[in-house]
From Swiss-Prot:
E.C. number(s) listed in UniProt: 4.1.1.48
Keywords, comma-separated and alphabetical: Amino-acid biosynthesis, Aromatic amino acid biosynthesis, Decarboxylase, Lyase, Tryptophan biosynthesis
Protein name: Indole-3-glycerol phosphate synthase
UniProt family annotation: Belongs to the TrpC family.
Pfam families in UniProt: IGPS
GO molecular function, one term: phosphoribosylanthranilate isomerase activity
One GO BP: L-tryptophan biosynthetic process
Lineage, top ranks: Bacteria, Pseudomonadati, Pseudomonadota, Betaproteobacteria, Rhodocyclales
Length: 264
């Protein structure tokens, strides 16, 4: 695990301890179970791909540890419908405060402003956060293989599926991919950003594809570094049709127009 990831995960464990003290697990679990049915995150992605179109998980992100503030004019309730009109399949909304200046309220505002399923983009280290995600309205969660043991991922996945949520498992290398393929979720995200150096290489996705050749039911989601139509074309030529993109859209005045420009 990289230094930045270790630091983030340590802060997350502190957040969970504080959250548990403020709101016991039984209460947040009841809140999660009382939510209306989740929107179908996996189905939205699969539907786009089946129709021969790219499935775009469009991200709503104000800042990042490596880049600082990415978007000053940050209004999730305006960004989400802009993405929806441009053809996004799903949303990804940062809820991490200390590192990405995100908030649960951003996810709620974005989801309320459109009909798209929304992923809680955060660093999950405890099952409490899975219930918390559904309680705030998230339709899917992210599990980062670098942060979690296989047993932890399996436990969180089972809880998420029990709550009707989708799961995106994120990997960075072959060892993490081997663990991810032991989960039930079809969604395997490959992050092209090296979390140790913050360098981005699309070869990360391309290099892991041979290991997924026999996994017909898996959907590869390429994450980070999709900045130009040529990047999209390269991925689609190699059979990758699902994309998680944020920064490229956040840096232009109209994020929906950015999505259209990138994916045609």
């Amino acid at each position: 695990m990289s230094d930045i990831l270790q630091k983030i995960c340590a802060v997350k464990r502190e957040e969970v301890t504080a959250a548990l003290a403020a709101k016991p697990l039984a209460i947040v679990r009841a809140e999660a179970e009382a939510q209306p049915a989740a929107r179908d995150f996996v189905g939205a992605i699969r539907g786009r791909i089946t129709a021969g179109r790219p499935a775009v998980i469009a991200e709503i992100k104000k800042a990042s540890p490596s880049k600082g503030v990415i978007r000053e004019d940050f209004r999730p309730a305006d960004i989400a419908p802009s993405y929806e009109a441009a053809g996004a399949a799903c949303l990804s909304v940062l809820t991490d405060k200390p590192f990405f200046q995100g908030a649960p309220e951003y996810l709620q505002a974005a989801r309320a402003a459109c009909a798209l399923p929304a992923l809680r983009k955060d660093f999950l280290v405890d099952a409490y956060q899975v219930y918390e995600a559904r309680a705030m309205g998230a339709d899917a969660i992210l599990l980062i293989a670098a942060c979690l043991s296989l047993a932890e991922m399996q436990d969180m996945e089972a809880i998420a599926h029990g709550l009707g949520m989708g799961v995106l498992v994120e990997v960075h290398d072959g060892a993490e991919l081997e663990q991810a393929l032991k989960l039930r979720t079809p969604l395997v995200g490959i992050n092209n950003r090296n979390l140790r150096t913050f360098e981005v290489s699309l070869q990360t996705t391309l290099g892991l594809l041979p290991r997924l050749a026999a996994e017909a039911d898996r959907i590869v989601v390429t994450e980070s570094g999709i900045l130009a139509p040529a990047d999209v074309a390269l991925m689609r030529e190699n059979g990758v049709n699902a994309f998680l993109v944020g920064e490229a859209f956040m840096r232009v005045p109209d994020p929906g127009a950015g999505l259209r420009a990138l994916f045609g």
